[in-house]
């Protein structure tokens, strides 16, 4: 009986194969994996924000990216961005219902510490982006942004339970109709757990703390936000996967505003949905 149980347990464990960790945390928090040398993929990656202090607010940004892994230590992505807006009755924002091509983004990821001798793996990600419309309001602007991330993870239970954490620095500069360049920056840190509940399906939770500043060098603090929510990853086939997250601002504050939460620099809720198609 004991040998039968041990054999059954071994079969169960064998069903849980090794996973690439890049997208298992829902993609707000990103894992360290860079894929297999020579891999190519197409990735529609949508980020959406919902809810301001009052009125109706929804805005999304979809990056249509080509991903290529020239070596096991380096990965590149690039492609156009499409944005959509549905804004009505939000103080400080003009009403808008529209969709438009909104720029171009690229990303370079490089492994700093490979998993092996070290229990942790760490990857550096740099993502420059150009936008022709403001990501919050949709008005025409000239915007340049650089998202810099340290992406780290470790395996707590082999092939089953994973811990990920990110550090974020995101400076940007924007020129609107007045012709004046305005600088701002967002910094943050995250922690995420992901559990492979059945083979190729991972559920988890993601926690982010974000701070916003006027000026690129932490000039004037304007507000902060804590986001928390569930994540889902599904390896649909050997060539296709899905990664999703939905997070709510559970704490935060805006400088000079009494109500809780920062709903000027951040949204009440945010979501992310990515599909990957290898070829």
Residue ranges and their predicted role:
Residues 3-7:
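N-terminal signal peptide c-region/cleavage motif recognized by signal peptidases
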Residues 10-279:
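Transmembrane beta-barrel domains of Gram-negative outer membranes and organellar outer membranes
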């Amino acid at each position: 009986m004991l040998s039968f149980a041990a054999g059954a347990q071994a079969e169960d464990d064998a069903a849980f194969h090794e996973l690439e960790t890049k997208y298992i945390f829902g993609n707000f928090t990103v894992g360290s994996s860079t894929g297999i040398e020579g891999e190519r993929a197409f990735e529609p990656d949508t980020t959406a924000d919902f809810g301001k202090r009052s009125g109706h607010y929804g805005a999304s940004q979809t990056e249509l990216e080509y991903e290529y892994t020239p070596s096991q230590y380096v990965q590149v992505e690039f492609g156009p961005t499409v944005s959509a807006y549905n804004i009505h009755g939000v103080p400080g924002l003009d009403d808008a219902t529209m969709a438009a091509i909104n720029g171009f983004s690229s990303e370079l990821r490089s492994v700093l510490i490979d998993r092996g001798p070290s229990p942790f793996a760490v990857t550096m990600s740099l993502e420059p982006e150009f936008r022709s419309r403001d990501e919050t309001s949709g008005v025409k602007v000239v915007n340049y942004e650089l998202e810099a991330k340290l992406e780290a993870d470790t395996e707590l239970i082999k092939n089953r339970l994973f811990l990920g954490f990110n550090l974020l620095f995101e400076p940007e500069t924007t020129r609107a109709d007045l012709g004046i360049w305005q600088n701002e920056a967002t910094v943050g840190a995250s922690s995420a757990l992901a559990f492979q509940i059945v083979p190729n399906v991972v559920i988890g939770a993601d926690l982010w703390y974000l701070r916003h500043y006027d000026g690129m060098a932490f000039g004037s603090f304007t507000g902060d936000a804590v986001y928390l929510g569930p994540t889902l990853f599904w390896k649909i086939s050997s060539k296709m996967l899905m990664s999703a997250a939905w997070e709510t601002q559970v704490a935060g504050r805006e400088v000079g505003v009494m109500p809780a939460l920062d709903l000027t620099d951040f949204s009440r809720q945010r979501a992310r949905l990515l599909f990957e198609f290898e070829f």
